Amino acid sequence: MNTLQRLCVVCSKCNECAMELECLKYCDPAIVLVDSAPFKRNALTVVHLYRRLCPALAEQNARYQASLITLYLEMLLRCLYEDVLLVDEALGEFERHGDRQRYYRRVLRLDRCACHDTLEVTFTERIRLTVDVATLNEVERLLCKINCVYGVLEPTRGLELCRRLLSLMGRLCGISPVAAPEAYVENLTCLQCYEELAAVPNQGRSILKRLRGLLCDHLTVRKSLVQLETGIQTMEQDIVETVGSRPRLSSLLELLKGLSSSAAVSHAYISEAEDTLRRYNLFTDIPPRIYSLSDFTYWSKTSEVIVQRVNVTVQQLNMYHSLCRTLRNELGQYLYGDRVEDLFTLSEAQLGEDERLYVGSIYAAPERIVDLMTSLSLQSFENNPVFNKLHENNEIYSKIRSLLEEIRRPLDGAGTRGAAAATAAGARGAAEGTGGAAAAGGAAAAAGEAAGGPFQCGDPAARAHDVVREVHVRKKAYLQKVSELGYNRVMQCIKGQEKLIKKLVNVNLLGTVCFEVLAKVINGFIRRRAYLERVDGVVDVDRLLQYDDHLYVVNNLVHRRLPAESLPALGQEFYRFVNGPVFQHHADRYPLPYNIDMAYACDNAGMLPHLKEDLVRLAEGTVAPSEWMVAPYRRFFDLGAALDLNELQKGFWAHVREIVFSVALYNEAFGKELRLCRADEPVDEERERLVVTYNVDGPLFLYAGGGVWKSKDLYLLLYQHLNGAAAPPPPAAPSPPPAEPATTAGASRKRPAVESPGVLLDLVRDADRESSLVPDCLLYDP
């Protein structure tokens, strides 16, 4: 078993202990004090694990590499440690004062709220933003925003912000694997909801419209619990094994089993039809009546039934709850000599019958309560005559019953023909619905014509046209249309509300989305910080080279042009370096282009459309270097002059574009193969590469010729690479240059290095004055 497997085992055991401790908070403290030895043993184990593992996990997550399990286990151990101490202190206080209300308020932390936090995000000395975070949805959304501004956030500040988010998640989630209802908002979507919708056709709808009203099942994962019958069987087995067979308990269990097994009234002829159809298969002769019976049975099962039949009513739910409470009190009296008074019994007397439906019961499965609420909501539509489709099932059942009677009755030839005619008439009746009313209306209209009416005189065509009958037909068709549209809308509304109720009522376990995203962001900042802390073997090129070396590379690039056909590929490289570490679909088995990752990042962060347009315009690029060379000398990613976050982002994008396009032009002009890499991605150690760290104090690292160079200026590193970078000697302390004696031989004296160009002559290197590459106009010295 390796270290990761051991860590998973420890996490599993800690989860088991956390679930038991969370349930213990809701139990009667008097009963807990009767046998508190197991709690004491578990508490000592938790304290030992916390002191042994938590500091090492915190150091690993902050300095080396974070993962989903290490982040979750660190949070869980810290919360477990705090909760076992809290419960132990609360039990000691309860033993002195005996107040259950006070005990529950203490262990459940009802007197204070620690689920709200205000985080300060510092980008530069001028730009500081505050963000209020109170739910898991807001944590996930803030991580998406951090991913979008990943390059302009210093790694030390980013890691500090991530640590505060992990602490807040510990306060939101606690030790329970079941997420608290106040810790999340069920109708706010996450990044996985976005990715799932992006993988299917949009049918002409925007992503925001498709996300609106969608229930998220990723931040918290809904789990359906067992039904009542399974719970009773398990309960009976546990009671027999614990206390044996007792008459009072056995009678209560029998009442519970009889209550839960009472089913709703169903159509007996459906079962009879299934028994009849069971005698036929692929190799038997199938009479027409059997085929019709199978057809109607199929439609009776697959057609939508508005009024659902459930196996429990409100009265049964209340009776079931009362019997379970009596059974619990009997067990408490037998085992501990006193009735059980846990948190759920304190305000139970104030609930009425219908209120029990909305509050629920700890003894009933949430799925059963959801079915009951849906059934009660739908029954209000049963008596509405507009919804004609409500009665179609009864017509289908009547056809099934008539077919069964015909099968049981011996039929002669005429009877067979009559049955076939009845079957055909039944099929027509099912299709026509309530056509009899229209026929009656037509007969009444004909009688009115015979008796004399307003259309008996005049145009013969008008007399031949039965207006009254047409009115009835059109009215029937209109009502049928309204019925179908209304029925579909009602069913759509009810299904949507049922999904929402199931999400609210059922158990929702804590998902892994926030931990996965947090681990990716932390690892990115850790790798960027590693370049800040790296000192050994790194030579600062800014101390070796001068401004004219910078100008030499710039002048050789500024008059060249990039091939126009290379712009799309360079745009993809631009998106690669602008994006954060969260969306990495370019590394999937079936990789997506970098612009898809960037689109996911922008949409999930909520970037405004005009900023997206600016980003795309920069990505499209131009072939002229004069339009993208914008970074000052030795100030790459030094954006302290920006006044707001939008200006800061645009400046960052411009610097990234300059790096991508200038390195591509450098490779094109000098025939090099220098590769650009991110600081937070795996690299090929054998290849020459230029690593972009985004850090102000060392944004660029050059790996070439066995040596490592860093600089705040791109073109100094390109000059170092152009000169044939070799392993540098150990850097020596710079010595002051010797004083030159005054002489009149000005031609033999070297020009001092200049920090900014004054005249065109200053752009020329002294070693190249006699070179044919330099125009004569630059060599003229008046």
Curated annotation (Swiss-Prot):
Subcellular location: Host nucleus
Pfam families named among the record's database cross-references: PRTP (PF01366)
GO cellular component, one term: host cell nucleus
GO biological process: viral DNA genome packaging
Transmembrane spans: none
Binding site for ATP: Y666, N667, E668, A669, F670, G671, K672, E673
Major location category of this protein: host cell
GO molecular function: ATP binding; zinc ion binding
Region Disordered, annotated ranges: 727-754
Record field: compositional bias (Pro residues): 727-740
Superkingdom of this protein's organism: Viruses
Segments forming C3H1-type zinc fingers: 190-218
Protein name: Tripartite terminase subunit 1
Lineage, broadest ranks: Viruses, Duplodnaviria, Heunggongvirae, Peploviricota, Herviviricetes
Gene assigned in the entry: TRM1
